[in-house]
Every structure is written in C-alpha cells, then in structure tokens.
C-alpha cells in the first residue's frame, strides 16, 4: 500500500531511518540528504510511504515551495527503496506520483547518480536538469592563511550575529533554490543539529565599516570519523573580488584539521565555475556527482 502521510508517527520515522541506513550500506552512498532527516518529524514536507505489511518498503520526501520561496525554487523529491523491494516498480510508481503532486518543474534527486537511478529516469522520460558535485581533499599540507589587513575573521558569537548572517546568506544565494530565502527558522534548525559548533562558523568583517562580508560554516560528520565538510561558504555580492571565498574556505579547513580530521568534502553546483576554480586551487577534486532529474 502506498499513501501520502501528512505526519509520520514514531514507528514510521524509526523504520524510515533504518531503511535509509540499509540503503546506504547497500549502495555505498546515502539515498537522501540531511534535510530529509530533519523533515521526518515535521510538517514542512509531504511524505509518500509504501508499506509491505507492517514494514516501510520505500519512502519519498517531497518539498513543495510556498509563495514566499525564491522564484527559482521548484518542488524537490528524494526517494529511498529498500534493497529487497527493488525491481518491483515501486520506485517508478512513487516518482510518477511525486511528479503529479509537485506540479510543473518538479525534480527528483539521485544521489551519486547511480546506474539504477539513470535507468529509472530514462524509463520515465526524465533528464538531468541540475548536477551537484561532491569534491574532496585531504586535510594535510594546507596552504598558509593570509588575512588582508582590511578584514577580520572571528567565529560566531550568538544571536547578535543572526541578522547579518541571514542578510549575507540570502544575498549570496538569491539564485539558489534551497539555500536562498532563508528565515530565522532555517538558522534555528541548523543550530539545533548535534553537529553544530559555533567555533566552526567563521565570519569575515570589514575592518573600517564592521560590516559582515562573508562566512564559512564548517561541519564535522559525527557518523563518519575523520570526515569534515565545507558546509556553506557565502560572500556578499558587494564584496566579491576581495578573495574572501578563498580566505574563508582556508580558515575553515585549518579549523577542521585542528580537530584531527583527515578528509574534507563539499558540494558545489556543476555550473558554478567561479566556485569550482576556487576549490580546485585549494586542492579539491570531484569525488561523485548528484543529479536532479525532471521533465525537459
């Protein structure tokens, strides 16, 4: 039985988390992003659940943007199917339902763009409309940090920094379907994550004006020993050209290395050539690519 569920009960939440772990173990990559895990306990997403008896055989998360969302926002779906329930048409049926429910422009993420996902997309007549690279590098032999005299860098101090952080984030990512248009609630959700460390959120200010110019939010993967992440690097468009992206990224890398981590990863849009060049100069290389499929 497959049905849309407005609110997941504790049993289903637990089974879905176990299903995600099982699929990750089978495929070598997580089938859904961290946002899906946050939304399991809320009402911000639509939940499509396929059950085999009392067990969850597949789960689809669908986020439909509201009227206040970025104009670039589209409905986004993420799907996980139990390894034992695959090749039975469950996944394709659920994707069809998501495309109908989400409306025109709906996209479905395929993490790692695995052959099975490519085959399903071909079957449904979908094409890759967006690609997101995961890049990695070792945290050894980092370049030295050189801070321009016109800039100061410090870590996050508390709620007094929130309005400036939102301002820069939403200016830097005004074009981005997920990262743009953040509210105080979006910050609060991430501050509530077990991995959040205020000492790992770095803010760059102009020395003369004290204005926030950019930030780098780092993340330590608690479930992957030795792994860190360049979670978000955002620079105010008005401050572009001052080398802040390079500086902030490097400050965060040194912080992660100081925690004893061995490897760092980040995600970047495949068509963001400026960011790609910055990260390549810092020694990052593409490790895998996620694809968002939809109708052309």
UniProtKB/Swiss-Prot annotation:
Keyword terms, alphabetized: Acyltransferase, Repeat, Transferase
Source organism: Mycobacteroides abscessus (strain ATCC 19977 / DSM 44196 / CCUG 20993 / CIP 104536 / JCM 13569 / NCTC 13031 / TMC 1543 / L948)
Cross-referenced NCBIfam families: mycothiol_MshD
Keyword Methyltransferase included in the entry's annotation: no
Enzyme type, top EC level: transferase
Catalytic activity: 1D-myo-inositol 2-(L-cysteinylamino)-2-deoxy-alpha-D-glucopyranoside + acetyl-CoA = mycothiol + CoA + H(+)
Annotated positions binding acetyl-CoA 2: 233-235, 240-246, 272-277
Lineage: Bacteria, Bacillati, Actinomycetota, Actinomycetes, Mycobacteriales
Keyword set includes Lipid metabolism: no
Residue ranges of domain N-acetyltransferase in the record: 1-148, 151-296
Database matches in Gene3D superfamilies: 3.40.630.30
EC number: 2.3.1.189
Residues the record lists as binding acetyl-CoA 1: 79-81, 87-92
Protein name per UniProt: Mycothiol acetyltransferase
Function summary: Catalyzes the transfer of acetyl from acetyl-CoA to desacetylmycothiol (Cys-GlcN-Ins) to form mycothiol.
Domain of life: Bacteria
Gene Ontology molecular functions: mycothiol synthase activity; protein-N-terminal-alanine acetyltransferase activity
Example GO BP: mycothiol biosynthetic process
Residues the entry annotates as binding 1D-myo-inositol 2-(L-cysteinylamino)-2-deoxy-alpha-D-glucopyranoside: 34, 178, 219, 229, 267
PROSITE patterns: GNAT
Family statement drawn from the similarity comment of this UniProt entry: Belongs to the acetyltransferase family. MshD subfamily.
